[in-house]
Amino acid sequence: MSNIQNMSLEDIMGERFGRYSKYIIQERALPDIRDGLKPVQRRILYSMNKDGNTFEKGYRKSAKSVGNIMGNFHPHGDSSIYDAMVRMSQDWKNREILVEMHGNNGSMDGDPPAAMRYTEARLSEIAGYLLQDIEKNTVSFAWNFDDTEKEPTVLPAAFPNLLVNGSSGISAGYATDIPPHNLSEVIDAVVYMIDHPKASLEKLMEFLPGPDFPTGGIIQGADEIKKAYETGKGRVVVRSRTEIEELKGGKQQIIVTEIPYEVNKAVLVKKIDDVRVNNKVPGIVEVRDESDRTGLRIAIELKKEADSQTILNYLLKYTDLQVNYNFNMVAIDHFTPRQVGLQKILSSYISHRKDIIIERSKFDKAKAEKRLHIVEGLIRVLSILDEIIALIRSSDNKADAKENLKVSYDFSEEQAEAIVTLQLYRLTNTDIVTLQNEENDLRDLITTLSAIIGDEATMYNVMKRELREVKKKFANPRLSELQAESQIIEIDTASLIAEEETFVSVTRGGYLKRTSPRSFNASSLEEVGKRDDDELIFVKQAKTTEHLLLFTTLGNVIYRPIHELTDLRWKDIGEHLSQTISNFATEEEILYADIVTSFDQGLYVAVTQNGFIKRFDRKELSPWRTYKSKSTKYVKLKDDKDRVVTLSPVIMEDLLLVTKNGYALRFSSQEVPIQGLKSAGVKGINLKNDDSLASAFAVTSNSFFVLTQRGSLKRMAVDDIPQTSRANRGLLVLRELKTKPHRVFLAGGVQSDTSAEQFDLFTDIPEEETNQQMLEVISKTGQTYEIALETLSLSERTSNGSFISDTISDQEVLVARTR
């Protein structure tokens, strides 16, 4: 018969993964609600206790303990066992350490511990209370992995370890994050709940107001703590403890003495220093980790004029000096993972301790009764001592003596065994008194144990007494301060930024930088660093407190605070937007750049190749949350081939749109509605099917120029294009030719000397040259031509203009721009 079974992969995977999930949920990552331990932690404690590796004895090599645990109870890698052992020894991870370790057991800086062959370990004193009475049949045992030895499924847990030390872990479909608490407060809450089983959460929180982290800190948010204790989920703010320390010379420094739970100190110091290096907060001179064996201390030295409170607020908001701690209190309850609140945790622990105390009392009672039975036999022997001695002397051997005692004097098997093994010195008068006293003590003990077993009130009194003994022995003060409200961190951004003069430059290809006036003035404008195939489109003097807006041909806008731009030399290329903006496309170009002081007022107009136009408010461009990594839309394009032709600030003038086929339309800018960023706009000009928009500009002068792809140029009067309404076809500004027709390559206003300053992107740059508007044309063969637009004579509307050179018509235009 074949052992091969045909099963679907879906069924096999589902069944196997379900089995695996159940294993890692119950046997690996989640703690038991009764003793607060994961299986590996329980096995470590039990194995070390079984081997006598306890607090009152000397330390033993960690490797020996790990080997015993792995060989007897936990058949997994030694690293997982050692890591768990090390964590239980770290006083910055546990409120009460369960393992004491000699040697390097890691640090708050995330340093790894020394190898287990170098360190030594033993159980801590309080860990002994988790294992107390385990030898008295108080908990159930199960066979280990190879059925050679039994291990406990839970520990007796004489204190509520789940709350005291907390727990964290991730399993299949479940995760847990239970914070540590103060031992005294937890025990007080348990004692109160023993007396008041239906105690309200509010009353319990009078005894246990919140977590108590081993690293201290300030916990904010009483309402969230209550929510977490009620539902098992919640989020609180954990803030570092800081103080402002005065230094000589009027300087100050921020001193950090406590940091949030689970925060890596070295990483925190590095992040704070990164803030200094990147000048995100001006005013930080130095960041030092001054921690030593006396305690944690991080010093943040400030400049003399620095605003210490504003800098501290910034660091709290943008570094791990303040973090959110998320409660997710999941534990194994009756073999099932459950999200539990405070009342459920306490009641489960009380129920567990009830079982432990009753089982322990039954064990002790049975032991006392067994001993009492023997003591009664010994006392009876002493009353008939001569007869017993004679009977034993007449017996053939020990077995015969025992049988004679049982037959002649009705002793039990146990009593007979005790009599025949009795040592002669025990027959003195003193020992008779001792036996009688022992009998009385045993009877009292049995009575007490019977009361504990039979009377619930007596049992609970024992439970409370034992808890109070643990509290008395191990109580320590609360480390974390609790604050009812979460404080909102307000940062005066303006006060963080040192106002400095700088020059901002942007290229069409997306390179940008800021340059100090010293570096800028040491070079000429032509020495700007850029790629050979790129073009400088924007240079302007600005303040570091201002803002830069970049509008692209694909309808995206990019925001950058000036102070966040990389400060580089004028001859450096700059930083490309693709390094930070994840959605900056390869074919995307910068169309327009603008520096603004505020976003309170201002309008922009955008015109696309498909002839659509819109106005939108600058207020909608105020910094968005993901501005550092993503651009946002300012206009919706109709299709993938559509591009934005013009973007400019709105002025109260007419707009003039010119198409490639030579149609020009003039209308008032007030006809264009103000719309949201996601809209595509309205029709600006009625295009023919084979036509598209070439240029659009505001009418701010009396004339404009038209350049064709063949290199023909003309200047014509604005009045030749009368004002009409938007969405019309417009008038032709070129004469149609049957062969080699002219198509508009670029059109724009011809600015006068007085009006040019308003539109010149380089007005803040000191130049000796006259401010004359020039048209630069580069042919496809690389020839460059420059024409002073004001020197052109006015042409008729229907003329095609004049070629700028004799050979340009054969070469055609590659690039054209005004400056």
Curated annotation (Swiss-Prot):
InterPro entries: GyrA/parC_rep, Gyrase/topoIV_suA_C, Topo_IIA-like_dom_sf, Topo_IIA_A/C_ab, Topo_IIA_A_a_sf, Topo_IIA_dom_A, TopoIV_A_Gpos, Type_II_DNA_Topoisomerases. Residues 30-496 form the Topo IIA-type catalytic domain. GO terms for molecular function: ATP binding; DNA binding; DNA negative supercoiling activity. Keywords: Cell membrane, DNA-binding, Isomerase, Membrane, Topoisomerase. Coiled coil: none annotated. HAMAP family: ParC_type2. Topoisomerase IV is essential for chromosome segregation. It relaxes supercoiled DNA. Performs the decatenation events required during the replication of a circular DNA molecule. This is DNA topoisomerase 4 subunit A. The lineage of its organism: Bacteria, Bacillati, Bacillota, Bacilli, Lactobacillales.
